[in-house]
From Swiss-Prot:
This is Erythropoietin. It comes from the Eukaryota. Its main location: secreted. Residues 1-26 form the signal peptide. SUPFAM superfamilies: 4-helical cytokines (SSF47266). It comes from Mus musculus (Mouse). It is found in: Secreted. Glycans are attached at residues 50, 64, 109. GO terms for biological process: acute-phase response; angiogenesis; apoptotic process; cardiac muscle tissue morphogenesis; cell surface receptor signaling pathway via STAT; cellular hyperosmotic response; embryo implantation; erythrocyte differentiation. Hormone involved in the regulation of erythrocyte proliferation and differentiation and the maintenance of a physiological level of circulating erythrocyte mass. Binds to EPOR leading to EPOR dimerization and JAK2 activation thereby activating specific downstream effectors, including STAT1 and STAT3. Belongs to the EPO/TPO family. Keywords: Disulfide bond, Erythrocyte maturation, Glycoprotein, Hormone, Secreted, Signal.
Length: 192
């Protein structure tokens, strides 16, 4: 007789270690398939959006930042191969990570950055790193390595934002939209 498994305890431990940037070696490879994991990151993104929305005009960025377009054509998305979806999600996540890091640099250069804003930027950076790690375990990064005889993926649609509120809105919408659709499909198929 072995020790009874405690998936809830494992999930809680994993959620505590992931934001620290520590590899979670004992985590199940399909941790992202647990809806509570993704919902936690979505909630953090929405909280950041709400905090920045609470300001009169919201803190402005000193320059425009390019972010992925979060609009989803559900008909086209369902017709895409999972590999194409993975490429779009991976590219979007990479661009979003760059955008948040750029916002962090702009915030650091401003005089007296709001402490709560800095906290949400730091949480977003940690969350994106964790999501990137979880997607690697899921195998999403492998989809970027396409054979030389295939056509290159369509360029990622982008837009620019000029406030922290808009940046966090894109972050939340990307997680709720493309990332959730992709992980849901992969987890349903059980391919990874």
């Amino acid at each position: 007789m072995g020790v009874p498994e405690r998936p809830t305890l494992l999930l809680l431990l994993s959620l505590l270690l992931i934001p620290l940037g520590l590899p979670v070696l004992c985590a199940p490879p399909r941790l992202i398939c647990d809806s509570r994991v993704l919902e936690r990151y979505i909630l953090e993104a929405k909280e950041a959006e709400n905090v920045t929305m609470g300001c009169a005009e919201g803190p402005r960025l000193s320059e425009n930042i390019t972010v992925p377009d979060t609009k989803v054509n559900f008909y086209a998305w369902k017709r895409m191969e999972v590999e194409e979806q993975a490429i779009e999600v991976w590219q979007g996540l990479s661009l979003l990570s760059e955008a948040i890091l750029q916002a962090q640099a702009l915030l650091a250069n401003s005089s007296q950055p709001p402490e709560t804003l800095q906290l949400h930027i730091d949480k977003a950076i940690s969350g994106l790193r964790s999501l990137t790690s979880l997607l690697r375990v899921l195998g999403a990064q492998k989809e970027l390595m396409s054979p030389p005889d295939t056509t290159p993926p369509a360029p990622l649609r982008t837009l620019t934002v000029d406030t922290f509120c808009k940046l966090f809105r894109v972050y939340a919408n990307f997680l709720r939209g493309k990332l959730k659709l992709y992980t849901g499909e992969v987890c349903r198929r059980g391919d990874r």
